[in-house]
Amino acid sequence: IVSALQTQAMGIDMSVYGPDTVVNKQSGKLFAKGMLSPFCREGRYYWRIPDSLLDRDWLLVCRIEAAAAGNRSRNDGYAGDQVNTALYRFEKKNDKQLYLRRMVLNERADTSGVIFPAYRKSNVQGIVMAFDVRAYANEEYEIDVTDWLQSDTDLLYFSATARGVLRLGGQQRDKSEVLSVRAYDRNVEIRTQKTYALQGGLGMATYLLHTSLLLL
């Protein structure tokens, strides 16, 4: 973990932050002021997770912004369709690593009730990602999210159900990319281009996806 001065020496110019800045490695705008303070350095995407946002719930919603031609399943596969939703929570493992848990809330219990300890023991939320802390400054943990954003994952993009309905096979990494990451006061908006091989050797399908992370 490096100090704040070392972080600045790595090229993070705080003075260029602006509320309307888009993080996009193809443009000159590489910093964004807003939720998670996303920025891009040498082609890598980074987020800063403040102490105050640990153990808070985040709602993820992924929609098709622009749909692939010729790949429909009755009423599915159109622009505007919601293809994933989930609830997440960042958690500190230690000073060198953060966990991301996917929250499954099928059961409830009163925190003041006698059954609550048993409820907690029967509802351990799954750890779906572990991020190394690259720097810590101003009570914020800097993590590299590049591989996560670029991956073929149902944590951010098409759910397993949606992939099955649309007959999507593996992601074509060389034909997929992160287009932009935009930060606001309570949410982060991620735009990506994703290309998939269709099951059964039926060709390729390219989608523009819009993923939102909203702090609840």
Q: What kind of feature is each model-predicted range?
A:
Residues 1-3:
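Bacterial N-terminal signal peptides
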Residues 5-216:
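Auxiliary tRNA-acceptor-end handling modules of aminoacyl-tRNA synthetases
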